[in-house]
């Protein structure tokens, strides 16, 4: 039987976290900051093991470190509260030697009737702690900032060398899917070299890890619009607000694709002038022309709804901003990104990005007619053999025509909704159609189904993109 290629989604969260820990150990060597021999001495890990980890990571990405998970035999596994106590003692006082900590933890275990760890176990736990964390605890925040904080982002010299993500609360009031007046958030990923927009996400929710991950998924993969060629794997990816706004899944995908994931601290500028100027451009050349713009005195105009606003924003980003000459680079962002016939580094397959998609926490049952999700039916011939089984679903809220189906951590198939297969439908349009249907029912008017309402709007609804060359969406095939 042919071996299936393994992706991050094939492994449990625990396995991926363990592999991430291995990567973080060899990361200073990969970035050219520390030799493997010095890492071996500081971490107490055999040099041959570090060489093997580095080789596996270079060849296979993060999955290589998962494949070669080693299990230590003959050692007692320490309880988490013992490990936490060891770390607490290590951070509490910089004068505490490892021998002192070992004696204190032995007394702690005797008092609580726990198994006492060996000196070697205590040593390994302390040496595995990030030096930056220890320095922050022992030396203070100012010392930490001077030593570890990034001062500025250097100027990039080629496309996809540096991507930046940032978020802003737009200065406009629009109608959300429920008809309420609201202000939307915009998440942007910009290529630093060309100023081209690689991905975007608009939502009424405040910035979060989920939205950043979905934007990165869109930015990396090929777009259906030929006027928007920006794609590929960036060498460095700066995301705002720190690790609280970056999911473990996004970190794992970044490691697997060899993206150097870096964070900007809240309230501390880190070379973010380009993307901040872009947000000013959005305000001055796009938003101020629309009803509901905060700085306009006229508040009597009818507000536009979310769907209409999103279509206008998409047109502005792709057909206007990306295609207009930028004064700082003396070129359009798209031409600059495409200069010298640039060929982006792409994932080997879409499966490598699956962890960036939304995950349904509750498993779904496969029925004889497929999988039922969000009021639609999704089918694929591969599901026939799994009727009655429960599967995990991942999906992109910007394209609800298909879902990714996983069975026991293995990718099973892409299931297609026959009702939506010929359209590019996002979850906001589904919510809008449901809202319209509820209004019809409240008025005792015979209402078409949600599906029919979506199709009607897609067939006859105005879209700003109609004024440009239409690009046909890739045909979806129901049989994988």
Swiss-Prot record:
Q: Where is this region: Disordered?
A: 438-480
**Alphabetized GO MF terms:** DNA binding
| Residue spans of biased composition, Basic residues class | 470-480
Q: Which GO terms describe its biological process?
A: DNA integration; DNA recombination; transposition
Record's keyword terms, sorted: DNA recombination, DNA-binding, Transposable element, Transposition
Which Pfam family, giving just one, matches this sequence?
rve
The record's annotation in InterPro entries points to: Homeodomain-like_sf, Integrase_cat-core, RNaseH-like_sf, RNaseH_sf, Transposase-like_Mu_C, Transposase_Mu_C
Tell me the PROSITE patterns matching this sequence: INTEGRASE
Ranges for domain Integrase catalytic: 155-341
Q: Which residues bind DNA?
A: 36-55
In Swiss-Prot or TrEMBL terms, this protein is called Transposase for transposon Tn552
């Amino acid at each position: 039987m042919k071996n299936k290629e393994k992706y991050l989604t094939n492994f449990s969260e625990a396995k991926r976290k363990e592999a991430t820990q291995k990567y973080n150990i060899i990361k200073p060597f990969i970035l050219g900051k520390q030799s493997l021999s010095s890492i071996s001495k500081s971490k107490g890990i055999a040099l041959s093991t570090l060489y093997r980890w580095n080789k596996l990571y270079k060849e296979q990405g993060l999955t290589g470190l998962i494949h070669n998970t080693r299990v230590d035999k003959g050692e007692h596994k320490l309880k988490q509260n013992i490990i936490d106590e060891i770390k607490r003692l290590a951070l509490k006082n910089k004068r505490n030697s490892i021998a002192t900590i070992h004696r204190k933890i032995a007394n702690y275990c005797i008092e609580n009737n726990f198994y006492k760890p060996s000196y070697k176990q205590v040593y390994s736990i302390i040496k595995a702690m990030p030096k930056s964390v220890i320095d922050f605890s022992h030396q203070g925040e100012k010392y930490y900032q001077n030593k570890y904080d990034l001062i500025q982002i250097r100027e990039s010299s080629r496309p996809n060398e540096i991507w930046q993500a940032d978020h802003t609360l737009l200065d406009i009031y629009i109608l959300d899917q429920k008809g309420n007046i609201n202000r939307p958030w915009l998440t942007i990923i910009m290529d630093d070299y060309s100023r081209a927009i690689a991905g975007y996400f608009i939502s009424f929710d405040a910035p979060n890890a989920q939205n950043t991950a979905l934007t990165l998924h869109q930015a990396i993969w090929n777009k259906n619009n030929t006027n928007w060629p920006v794609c590929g794997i960036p060498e460095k990816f700066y995301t705002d607000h720190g690790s609280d706004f970056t999911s473990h899944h996004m970190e794992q995908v970044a490691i697997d694709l060899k993206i150097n994931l870096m964070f900007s601290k809240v309230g501390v500028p880190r070379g973010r002038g380009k993307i901040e100027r872009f947000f000013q451009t959005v305000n001055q050349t796009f938003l101020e022309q629309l009803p509901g713009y905060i700085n306009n005195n006229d508040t009597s105009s009818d507000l536009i709804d979310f769907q209409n606003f999103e279509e206008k924003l998409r047109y502005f980003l792709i057909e206007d901003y990306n295609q207009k000459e930028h004064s700082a680079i003396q070129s359009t962002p798209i031409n600059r990104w495409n200069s010298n016939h640039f060929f982006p580094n792409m994932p080997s397959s879409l499966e490598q990005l699956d962890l960036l998609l939304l995950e349904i926490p509750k498993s779904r049952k496969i029925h004889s007619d497929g999988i039922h999700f969000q009021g639609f039916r999704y089918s694929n011939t591969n599901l026939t053999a799994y009727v009655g089984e429960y599967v995990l679903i991942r999906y992109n809220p910007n394209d609800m025509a298909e879902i990714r189906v996983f069975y026991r951590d293995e990718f099973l198939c892409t299931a297609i909704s026959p009702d939506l297969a010929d359209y590019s439908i996002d979850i906001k349009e589904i919510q809008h159609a449901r809202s319209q249907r509820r209004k019809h029912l409240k008025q005792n008017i015979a209402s078409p189904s949600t599906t029919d309402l979506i199709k009607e709007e897609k067939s006859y609804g105005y879209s700003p993109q109609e004024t440009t060359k239409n690009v046909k969406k890739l045909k979806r095939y129901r049989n994988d």
